[in-house]
A protein has these predicted regions:
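N-terminal accessory beta-strand-rich subdomains and adjacent acidic, glycine-rich linkers
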Residues: 5-273
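Aromatic- and carboxylate-enriched substrate-binding clefts and catalytic-loop regions
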Residues: 331-508
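Glycan-recognition and catalytic regions of carbohydrate-active enzymes
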Residues: 528-575, 579, 610-614
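Carbohydrate-binding surface patches
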Residues: 559-599, 639-641
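C-terminal beta-strand-rich structural cap/linker in extracellular carbohydrate-active enzymes
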Residues: 620-647
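N-terminal secretory targeting modules
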Residues: 648-679, 684-694, 723-724, 852-854
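Oxyanion-hole/transition-state-stabilizing segment in secreted/luminal serine hydrolases
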Residues: 678, 684-703, 710-752, 774-780
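Catalytic His-Asp segment of secreted/periplasmic serine-dependent ester chemistry enzymes
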Residues: 774-854
Length: 854
């Protein structure tokens, strides 16, 4: 094909366009809505034999394809992700260049097509801009020479300055967000980084172009660094990577947002990660929260033992976690003998088998901290033996590199841990780059200037408040972060001090709570001491209850470096979090999409939070009819709220305890006799949301209310069932009695209420259909009730026996959705209690198979 050829590619909606110019060089240009955001930028790859991909190019063949599909992640901030892009492949001699256009960005990669493995000498990836735009730049920290900058934990505050003022001797790690034309933001990152060094950016010429730089392949590595746990590079080769003949190189990504808040929910980096192997089952991966020891320096008080790295301390942490529904406890640095880099030399004060057994008996998992060198040395043995002991994962720390061998270590660690059903939390790490999609047991990454820096990092001036309203638009675009929030000691800007053993956060108490909503973190730390949390029960309950993975995430408001507000849904419950910079701020959030919630639980900055950052107000407020909620934040403040459809203790005194009003208007619209009323709680209510058409097609009416118990259904059976005069009443209820949503009730009394409703239906000429309760391994909003499976089985046995003795049809949802351990099949659940769309399909078939026989 002739030189000088130009190719064009557009995203599915046409919002993003890519132009590729091919000839003596290859350049790509990216525009959004007609505005060019990336000027022609050269790309190439130089091999060890001197050949250059991307110079004097002859395209032999082109191929286009379009993809539009819904994906179900194992672990993510959404239960469903829409993937939609157009792709162009330019096939050349020995390689291809693949370009993709999404509606919010574009990406490219090189793919080898050779017969033998080879080495990559250099790669050119330019990012050219039309002006000297400002950017959020995470420079590596000060080191003695240029090459040493590649030994980094990727923890730096942002320097916000024009790219033309880039420090010539400095490099910066990814992501970087550039403030471009017309208020647009351009975020640069990478994904599918599995066998190649990580990309950094530099600007050696001081112009409007950023250039990629990469750590060269290590030649000599010595054990050293922090407690002899790091690999120290002594010399490097003159090439970047050794790769396979068919190597698919990492994606180079340019994300373009018209509004800053679009960056908060951009899925492109995750989508460009490699899909897990189809035969892999990651249902065993259990996200959750962790009681952490290191940040609070094992600082317990009011106990009758000396706190520290010992059995008594960790049993206390385990008891604390169990009592408050916290899934994990971490044993951070100190459980293994110092400076030995040996995970099997345990200090005498720690009895790991005993602690694992003790934790398991309390329903708590243990996670072990491991230095890089020690974990690399004994990876297989450590994973095998500690998984057999009952350990649930490793927090692997102090890698502080992303050359090719280190990238390969990450992948090997993920693969090995997965074989033994272990999670991995990488600290001293680079940003997420797709591995967390390929191996969902990679549950979190650090690579962030987190709260640990308040413990005494006096070398650098610290401003975490500004940083915290910047990372959602930069670092978190790449993926989740282990920021480790949750401090109960809080300080204003003026009052902040470094106190290592009794550390404090910058900003208000409510800020710490809101960060659990704003920041993505499938494994989320509680950084403070159990002793401090136990004095702050309201805050502890909020943190313990907040989910770590979500069904839906909505970006509400945001301006990078100034403020951010996010809403997230898990099941029927919504959480909203907002943060501001050092300026007091008031936002009006449009939450009308939530709906159906009478009250909201709010944590807001107190009237004196600008002076005493711990000051906050916890209250329940009516949810406005128009859904517009005013949010006021103090300097360095935050705001958090929960919107629960199920009744809470404060609702017990409400005049409409039974929620008669919920369906009052809808009942007036029922003109024809329903074939059946499906009567129940949130499982029935969600059915309407998930498959309204199916209900309508079968003349079924849904009358479920989230959180309700048998006592409440018994109150409203007349208006919501009897007065509608259906042929059948399909009764599915009882899980919220077991959860004690309205306080204690025995299984026998729950069953008695069910029988009363059956008899009321019969007395009014309605045929009852009884249902077994769906399986559930835990009740997320009431974890303190313990394992619900024995009570579910007991209640189901009573229901089944009564139905059989009295000739009443029985729909056995439990058997249809259950796996051998009594849990709901992971294919059918959203949160251990509630079915997903596939679960409802199974329930529909099960119900119809019974009704068709009547």
């Amino acid at each position: 094909m002739a030189a000088g050829k130009s190719y064009k590619l557009q995203s599915p909606s046409g919002s993003v366009s890519v132009e590729i110019a091919v000839g003596q060089d290859v350049t790509w240009t990216v525009s959004r809505d007609g505005t060019r955001v990336l000027e022609p930028s050269a790309i190439s790859m130089t091999l060890e034999d001197g050949s250059v991909w991307g110079q004097n190019v002859k395209v032999r063949k082109t191929a286009k394809r379009s993809v539009s599909r819904d994906l179900t992640p194992w672990v993510y901030r959404q239960s469903s992700v829409r993937e939609s892009y157009n792709e162009l492949t330019l096939q050349c001699s020995g390689y291809s260049m693949v370009f993709r256009a999404y509606d919010m960005g574009a990406a490219y990669r090189f793919v080898a097509a050779r017969k033998e493995p080879f080495k990559v000498k250099e790669e050119k990836a330019s990012f050219c801009f039309a002006g000297n735009f400002s950017a959020f730049i995470p420079y590596t920290r000060e080191v003695k020479d240029y090459d040493s900058q590649f030994s980094t934990s990727c923890e730096s505050q942002y320097t916000r300055e024009p790219i033309g003022q880039w420090r010539k001797d400095k490099i910066a790690f990814l992501p970087i967000t550039v403030e471009a034309l017309d208020g647009m933001k351009v975020c640069i990152t990478e994904s599918d980084l599995l066998n190649y060094p990580g990309m950094y950016l530099s600007n050696p010429d001081g112009d409007n172009a950023l250039e990629a730089v990469f750590p060269r392949y290590p030649k000599d590595i010595e054990q050293g660094g922090h407690n002899m746990l790091q690999g120290i590079i002594k010399s490097r080769e003159d090439y970047l990577a050794e790769v396979s003949a068919q190597e698919a190189f990492p994606w180079r990504i340019v994300i373009v947002s018209k509004e800053d808040k679009e960056l908060l929910t951009c899925d492109i980096p995750w989508l460009l990660g490699r899909e897990p192997a189809p035969e892999m089952d990651f249902s065993w991966v259990k996200p959750g929260k962790v009681a952490w020891d290191w940040w609070n320096a094992w600082n317990l008080y009011g106990v009758d033992f000396e706190a520290g790295v010992n059995n008594a301390t960790y049993k206390y942490y385990i008891d604390f976690a169990a009592k408050n529904g916290i899934e994990y406890v971490i044993l951070d640095e100190g459980w293994a003998v110092n400076k030995k880099a040996d995970l099997f030399q345990v200090v005498p004060e720690i009895d790991l088998p005993m602690l694992c057994e003790y934790a398991a008996g309390k329903g708590v998992g243990l996670i072990l901290w491991a230095g890089y060198w020690a974990f690399e040395k004994d990876m297989e043995k450590a994973c095998r033996e500690y998984s057999e002991m009952g350990v649930k994962g490793f927090k692997v720390d102090f890698m502080d590199r992303d050359d090719q061998p280190m990238i390969q270590f990450y992948r090997r660690a993920a693969e090995t841990a997965a074989r033994y059903h272990l999670m991995v939390d990488f600290h001293g790490a680079f940003k997420p780059s797709g591995l967390q999609r390929t191996w969902p047991n990679v549950i979190n990454y650090e690579g962030v200037y987190g709260l640990e820096n308040v413990k005494g990092n006096k070398k650098y001036e610290i401003d975490l408040v500004t940083y915290e309203v910047s990372i959602p638009f930069v670092r978190l675009v790449a993926g989740p972060s282990d920021y480790t929030q949750g401090a109960m000691r809080n300080a204003t800007r003026k009052n902040f001090r470094y106190v290592s053993s009794e550390a404090m956060s910058q900003g208000t108490r409510c800020r710490q709570l809101a960060e659990y909503v704003v920041f993505d973190a499938p494994l989320n730390m509680l950084c403070d001491s159990p002793s401090n949390y136990l004095k702050e029960q309201e805050c502890l309950k909020f943190i313990a209850d907040v989910p770590t993975v979500w069904d839906q995430t909505v970006a509400l408001e945001g301006k990078a470096g100034e403020y951010v507000a996010v809403a997230r849904r898990k099941g029927d419950t919504w959480y909203v979090g907002a943060l501001t910079d050092w300026n007091a701020r008031e936002l009006t959030l449009d939450l009308s999409f939530i709906g159906g919630v009478p009250l909201m639980e709010v944590f807001r900055d107190g009237a004196n939070a600008h002076r005493a950052a711990r000051d906050y107000k916890h209250e329940w407020k009516e949810f406005p009819l128009d859904g517009k909620v005013s949010v006021k934040m103090a300097p360095g403040g935050g705001w958090a709220a929960v919107f629960r459809p199920e009744p809470q203790p404060w609702e017990n005194t409400d005049k409409d305890w039974a929620r008669y009003s919920y369906y009052e208007e809808k009942n007036k619209d029922v003109e024809t006799r329903p074939r059946a009323v499906l009567f129940g709680d949130s499982i029935t209510r969600n059915w309407v949301r998930e498959d309204r058409r199916w209900l309508k097609n079968h003349n079924f009416v849904g009358r479920g209310i989230s959180g309700q118990t048998t006592a409440q259904l018994l109150c409203r059976i007349r208006p919501d069932v009897i007065d509608l005069n259906p042929e059948y009443m399909v009764l599915l209820i009882g899980i919220n009695d077991i959860a004690r949503n309205n306080g204690y009730i025995s299984v026998e009394n729950t069953f008695g209420n069910i029988v009363s409703m059956v008899q009321l239906a019969q007395a009014n000429g309605i045929k009852p259909v009884m249902c077994t309760l769906c399986p559930a391994r835990e009740i997320g909003w009431r974890k303190r009730v313990g394992d619900p499976r024995p009570m579910i089985d007991k209640l189901n046995a009573l229901i089944s026996a009564y139905a059989k003795e009295n000739g009443i049809p029985l729909v056995d949802y439990n058997s249809a959705l259950r796996i051998p351990d009594g849990s709901m099949d992971p294919r059918y659940e959203t949160d251990a209690v509630h079915p997903n769309k596939d679960g409802y399909k199974v329930m529909e078939q099960t119900l119809l198979s019974v009704l068709e026989k009547l």
